[in-house]
């Protein structure tokens, strides 16, 4: 795994086009082990926008519903594409997905809400001391909201929860929240000890002893909560992250950033789904050269013209197909070289239609369980 997440050269790998990949991969190229791991409680699905995170998270949830007692698919992406994927309206309350009796979905907003339990009346100077101190930590408002959200999720009685997350940048901010809370709340707890004498004097002058203690009870509660969430995040038996990408530069680059950040935070990640992959066409007896030889045997000029037009169009399509495969092979090779020793890399084919509706998502979910070689292009 490369070291410098911000360095473009960290993703530079030699491109080998020696053979169309038929060799054994280092890890199984499917998600069977993920689905069969019954100890997992939280599965996060993340990556760059537009790479198929929602389709992948929905598919994982469908497969888990076959193995687990109860499954919740939870969308934290502000776009909330889960409703569109299933052609069913979901809200911020768990709703059974049509045709299931154990698979639920809900869509929530992870942005800061004024309803957070730490809300304190700002009109009173004494009560505003703690919020003002908290605001000196950028992002603490969202972090507090996130902590309460994760605590309520932790208390939900589902066998496993699949998180359909927002694009990478937003997800990285969410992952940073437990550390931010630990730092901010730890600072306030230490501050109380250092200023104990001053606070006692203020309490005696203002008769606000109960309010001070109430504030610090909340701080201690939030601190305990954030530690619990962080422990859950860092327990590989309970939590894992599935990275989703496509074989293009920006997507592979963001995947590397995400994996490096997960590694720094000790969050388990051992599955990568690569969507929109162009696989080899299986048609050994059909090629342009044979068509051109056949054209020479045709005597009728009208048929010749029509057939020649078809050959020219086929050449154009073949050029596009080969160019696409060569480009994808460059990034598939990078993915394989970077992660082949550590990850289950699942390549999913470019499909002809959008994946919307239960039937299409179910078909896609079955493909996630089928092993496929990473299709590195080679000229014949």
Swiss-Prot record:
Residues the entry annotates as binding ATP: 48-55, 248, 275
Keywords of this entry: ATP-binding, Cytoplasm, Endoplasmic reticulum, Hydrolase, Nucleotide-binding, Transport
Residue numbers annotated as active site: 77
Pfam families: ArsA_ATPase
Compartment annotation: Cytoplasm; Endoplasmic reticulum
EC number of this enzyme: 3.6.-.-
Main localisation: cytoplasm
Gene Ontology MF terms: ATP binding; ATP hydrolysis activity
Listed InterPro entries: Anion-transp_ATPase-like_dom (IPR025723), ATPase_ArsA/GET3 (IPR016300), ATPase_ArsA/GET3_euk (IPR027542), P-loop_NTPase (IPR027417)
Enzyme class: hydrolase
GO aspect biological process, one term: tail-anchored membrane protein insertion into ER membrane
GO cellular component: GET complex
Description of how the protein assembles with itself and partners: Homodimer.
The protein's role, per its UniProt record: ATPase required for the post-translational delivery of tail-anchored (TA) proteins to the endoplasmic reticulum. Recognizes and selectively binds the transmembrane domain of TA proteins in the cytosol. This complex then targets to the endoplasmic reticulum by membrane-bound receptors, where the tail-anchored protein is released for insertion. This process is regulated by ATP binding and hydrolysis. ATP binding drives the homodimer towards the closed dimer state, facilitating recognition of newly synthesized TA membrane proteins. ATP hydrolysis is required for insertion.
PANTHER family tied to this protein: ARSENICAL PUMP-DRIVING ATPASE ARSENITE-TRANSLOCATING ATPASE, ATPASE GET3
Family statement: Belongs to the arsA ATPase family.
Protein name in UniProt: ATPase ASNA1 homolog
Species this protein is from: Plasmodium yoelii yoelii
Organism classification: Eukaryota, Sar, Alveolata, Apicomplexa, Aconoidasida
């Amino acid at each position: 795994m490369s070291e410098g997440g911000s360095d473009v050269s960290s993703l530079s790998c030699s491109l080998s086009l020696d053979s169309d990949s038929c060799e054994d991969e280092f890890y199984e190229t499917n998600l069977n082990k993920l689905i069969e791991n019954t100890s997992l409680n939280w599965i996060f699905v993340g990556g760059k926008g537009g790479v198929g995170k929602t389709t992948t998270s929905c598919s994982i949830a469908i497969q888990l519903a076959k193995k687990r007692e109860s499954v919740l698919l939870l969308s934290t992406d502000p776009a909330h594409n889960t409703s569109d994927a299933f052609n069913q309206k979901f809200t911020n309350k768990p709703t059974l997905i049509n045709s299931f009796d154990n698979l639920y979905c809900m869509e929530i907003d992870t942005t800061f809400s004024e309803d957070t339990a730490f809300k304190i009346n700002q009109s009173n100077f004494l009560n505003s001391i703690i919020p003002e101190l908290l605001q000196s930590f950028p992002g603490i408002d969202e972090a507090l909201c996130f902590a309460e959200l994760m605590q309520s999720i932790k208390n939900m009685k589902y066998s496993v929860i699949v998180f359909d997350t927002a694009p990478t940048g937003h997800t990285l901010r969410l992952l940073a929240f437990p550390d931010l809370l630990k730092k901010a709340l730890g600072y306030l707890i230490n501050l109380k000890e250092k200023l104990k004498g001053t606070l006692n004097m203020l309490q005696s002058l203002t008769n606000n002893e109960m309010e001070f203690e109430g504030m610090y009870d909340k701080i201690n509660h939030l601190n305990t909560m954030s530690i619990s969430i962080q422990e859950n995040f860092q327990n590989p038996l309970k939590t894992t992250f599935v990275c989703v990408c496509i074989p293009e530069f920006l997507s592979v680059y963001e995947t590397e950033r995400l994996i490096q950040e997960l590694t720094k935070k000790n969050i388990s990640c051992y599955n990568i789904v690569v969507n929109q992959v162009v696989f080899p066409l299986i048609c050994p007896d059909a090629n342009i050269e044979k068509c051109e030889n056949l054209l020479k045997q045709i005597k009728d000029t009208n048929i010749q013209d029509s057939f020649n037009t078809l050959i020219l169009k086929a050449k154009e399509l073949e050029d596009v197909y080969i160019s696409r495969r060569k480009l994808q092979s460059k990034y598939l090779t990078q993915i394989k070289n970077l992660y082949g020793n550590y990850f289950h890399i699942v390549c999913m084919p470019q499909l002809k239609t959008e994946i919307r509706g239960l039937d299409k998502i179910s078909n896609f979910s079955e493909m996630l369980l089928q092993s496929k070689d990473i299709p590195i292009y080679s000229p014949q």
